[in-house]
Regions:
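Sec-dependent N-terminal signal peptides
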Residues: 1-5
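A residue-level marker of the well-folded mature domains of exported/periplasmic proteins
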Residues: 18-415
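C-terminal motif of bacterial Sec signal peptides marking the signal peptidase cleavage site
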Residues: 9-13
Length: 415
């Protein structure tokens, strides 16, 4: 995979008005804007069924951006759905930077009575750990983080999902489209080049674009891919510029791991097929949208909230799967190739059954060689020292909770 840097920067991650419990009022009852971002305190709602209702939990959520970010909107929607399903009170804080503001937001939520607090961005982690140490009676969870298994705190947890499975399936959708373009004479086999707009050179991003590429190559053997990085999780101008440069460089299909509409809208303007992330972009890009993969966080939120209600421990590392409903594809767009739905369903069944492993070492090489062994940096020291063997049984074991839930695949494969 060819990687290009587009303004890559130094590595960095992906007010408390209390609300009265109202029982049936789903409306937001307070909203204030503070220096750290926006706080919304939402009232409790009736649980979907009596059997779903929990008591004794007030949840607080910290988001890097607001609903304008597809990444954060995905979390916002899941938090709302889970809390309303379980009938609990919850508060949200949006536009919280990856800095001391995250610690302050966590403390404000704890002081407002939240006993389950969740933060959604990689760079929030150190500040949430700091808050967890200060509030030992509050349970804190953090998405995409790497340190729960080494911190040794009973009240700090990491969570993620096997989104590489979703990316792989989305790659199959892309590969099927490339095959259609080849069959129609729009491109030759040698011109089946995809482009990928990534945010940072994190393992999470590398894991994602590699699984997407492997999915595409499983059905379109001649595919190649160029990858570029913007140095930001959310920069619509940079993402649009990156997509346009990839298109100008001969890429005939674009995907991304960045949070704005920059790449999808560039594709719609250029008439280039697009595979998006974190939610369907079909409404804005009806002519070029193919599919989107996402982590569905609702199952994790329900699990963690029920643990707090029951007084049972939350897993130190939790990784959702296709089976738990934590990894999802959107509905297919109208521009997909014929037979795509059937190909995706067959591949999904094989992934769930364990017949297919995304990082099967027989399906890729690194510098022309099979990856028979690889030590990953699981414990995350400042020097990123490799410390655990993660290749066994013929495949790279990504996001294995025996190690940690956050991705650690940081291998640049051939292609």
């Amino acid at each position: 995979l060819a990687a290009m840097a587009l303004a890559v920067t130094a590595l960095a991650g992906c007010g408390s008005n209390d609300a009265a419990t109202t029982g049936t009022d789903a409306a937001t009852v307070a909203a204030t804007t503070e220096a750290a971002g926006t706080t919304e305190a939402a009232g409790t709602t009736e649980a979907a069924t009596d059997s779903e209702a929990v008591t004794g939990v007030k949840a607080g959520f910290i988001f890097l951006h607001d609903e304008n970010s597809t990444y954060d909107l995905n979390f916002l929607n899941a938090a709302k759905a889970a809390c309303e399903k379980l009938g609990i009170e919850y508060m949200t804080k949006t536009n919280i930077p990856e800095g001391q503001e995250a610690y302050e937001a966590a403390c404000e939520l704890a002081d407002a009575g939240c006993n389950f607090i969740f933060a959604d961005s990689f760079g929030h982690e150190d500040y949430i750990i700091e808050a967890a140490k200060e509030y030992p009676d509050v349970q804190f969870s953090h998405a995409t983080g790497t340190k729960a298994h080494t911190e040794g705190l009973d009240n700090f947890h990491n969570a993620f999902a096997s989104i590489y499975d979703g990316r792989y399936l989305a790659g199959i959708v892309a590969g099927m489209k490339l095959n259609e373009m080849i069959a129609n004479g729009d491109i030759t086999e040698d011109q089946a080049k995809m482009g990928y707009v990534g945010a940072y050179t994190y393992a999470e991003v590398m894991s994602g674009y590699t699984s997407f590429f492997l999915g595409a190559r499983s059905v379109c053997p001649s595919v190649t891919m160029d990858v570029t990085f913007t140095g930001s999780w959310y920069d619509e101008t940079a993402e649009k510029e990156a997509a346009n440069k990839l298109i100008e460089g001969g890429c005939v299909l674009i995907s991304q791991h960045a949070d704005s509409m920059g790449a999808p809208t560039a594709c719609e303007t250029a008439g280039v097929p697009n595979v998006s992330y974190n939610g369907s972009t079909e409404a804005a890009c009806p002519n070029t949208f193919l599919v989107s993969s996402r982590v569905n966080w609702e199952p994790y939120f329900e699990y963690a909230i029920k643990c707090v209600a029951d007084g049972t421990p939350i897993d130190t590392d939790w990784c959702g799967t296709l089976e738990t409903g934590s990894v999802e594809l959107s509905d297919l767009g109208t521009a997909v190739a014929e037979g795509t739905a059937e190909a995706v369903e067959a591949a999904k069944a094989d992934l769930i059954a364990g017949k297919t492993h995304v990082y099967d070492i027989t399906t890729f090489t690194v510098d022309g060689k099979t990856l028979d062994s690889y030590e990953a940096d699981i414990d995350t020291d400042p020097d990123y020292t490799p410390d655990h063997e993660v290749v066994s049984d013929g495949y790279f074991h990504e996001s294995d909770v025996a190690f940690r839930s956050a991705p650690y695949f940081n291998v640049r494969i051939d292609g």
